């Protein structure tokens, strides 16, 4: 039997471990985002859009913090969406949509979200698309709703330190790979492609994403994102959390 079908939770947990090799403070950014959701939502049952949500990492943490929450995961990756569907089951909705297409909102089952949350995802989009996307995100939020984006956002006033932090993190990560303490990005995907259930989805993923797609990262400083959120019409925007070369920015509709 497929390792996926026998225990889909294994894949969810292995994704978390693989991501934590890149982001040692991954849970801290999630906690900061959820605290902001709690502060801006009445009733303790927020309606949350997990944007570019992959395996549903954020959604699972939303449900753990707010058991009555309604979550929607939006992504385009067939492998990650399959894991999200198995992990959430009847507790959430998974939507297949491309954020590079301005028509992504038409695929949502509803709008008026209390929160739209995303992490370590939008750096794959070009600057002009991110700026436009912020305006589109604002439109699916209820008045007073919150948007949070946690990603690679180096401090522009610390270029030397930022470079050293990146190099240090890379060296630590490679050491963990070499010792077997962590699974690398490429190894994780190779394992998924070898799984009986996920293999067809991995093949579909290769058709959707050209081989060079994930080589083009765009990581401006947090202030760029804050300015873009203000231009997009958010009433307030700023930095919620920072850890090394990463940050979480938020905007209030």
Which role fits each region the language model picked out?
Residues 49, 56-104:
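Class I SAM-dependent methyltransferase SAM/SAH-binding core
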Residues 1-44, 57-61, 148-184:
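Conserved class I S-adenosyl-L-methionine
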Residues 217-232:
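Short alpha-helix
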Residues 232-253:
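Core SAM-dependent methyltransferase catalytic element
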Residues 120-124:
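Short catalytic micro-motifs in class I SAM-dependent methyltransferases
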Residues 117:
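A conserved beta-strand element that flanks and buttresses the S-adenosyl-L-methionine
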């Amino acid at each position: 039997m497929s390792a996926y079908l026998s225990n889909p939770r294994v894949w969810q947990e292995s994704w978390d471990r693989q991501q934590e090799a890149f982001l040692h403070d991954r849970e801290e950014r999630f906690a900061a985002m959820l605290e902001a959701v709690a502060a801006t939502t009445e009733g303790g049952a927020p309606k949350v859009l997990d944007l570019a949500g992959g395996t549903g990492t954020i959604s699972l943490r939303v449900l753990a913090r707010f058991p009555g929450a309604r979550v929607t995961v939006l992504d385009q990756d067939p492998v990650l969406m399959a894991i999200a569907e198995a992990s959430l089951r009847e507790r959430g909705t998974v939507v297949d949509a491309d954020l590079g297409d301005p028509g992504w909102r038409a695929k949502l089952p509803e709008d008026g979200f209390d929160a739209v949350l995303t992490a370590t995802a939008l750096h794959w989009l070009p600057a002009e698309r991110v700026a436009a996307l912020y305006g589109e995100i604002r439109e699916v939020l209820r008045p007073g709703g919150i948007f949070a984006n946690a990603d690679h956002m180096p401090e522009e006033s610390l270029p030397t330190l930022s470079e050293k932090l990146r190099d240090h993190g890379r060296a630590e990560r490679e050491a963990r790979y070499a010792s077997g303490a962590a699974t690398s990005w490429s190894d994780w995907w190779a394992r998924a492609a070898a799984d009986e259930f996920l293999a067809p989805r991995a093949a579909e993923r290769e058709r959707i994403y050209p081989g060079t797609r994930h080589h083009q990262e765009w990581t401006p400083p947090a202030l760029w994102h804050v300015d873009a959120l203000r231009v997009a019409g958010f009433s307030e925007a700023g930095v919620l959390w920072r850890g090394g070369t990463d940050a979480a920015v938020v905007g209030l509709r």
